[in-house]
């Protein structure tokens, strides 16, 4: 009998599925276009997006994440976004527990 995936393995599977869901909207499931990025941010990270006071923040994020400057995010570039957000959330959590 096969073992069930661990919580970490399920998280990885979820990240892959979310990337594929958003990358596949325009037919290319290997990269997220700018339009797909905006949809991703407004649906999957809606609270983060809605809390931004600067309307240009998403454009700047896309440019900063797009390391090869092709106007799209591959899976590694997508993971850089997720990792950066996870670090920021962890830092916030640590600060809140030290009060």
Swiss-Prot record:
It comes from the Eukaryota. Homodimer; disulfide-linked. InterPro entries: EF-hand-dom_pair (IPR011992), EF_Hand_1_Ca_BS (IPR018247), EF_hand_dom (IPR002048), S100/CaBP7/8-like_CS (IPR001751), S100_Ca-bd_sub (IPR013787), S100A11 (IPR028482). The modification N-acetylmethionine is found at residue 1. Its main location: cytoplasm. The modification Phosphothreonine is found at residue 8. This is Protein S100-A11. It comes from Sus scrofa (Pig). Residues 10-47, 53-88 form the EF-hand domain. GO terms for cellular component: cytoplasm; nucleus.
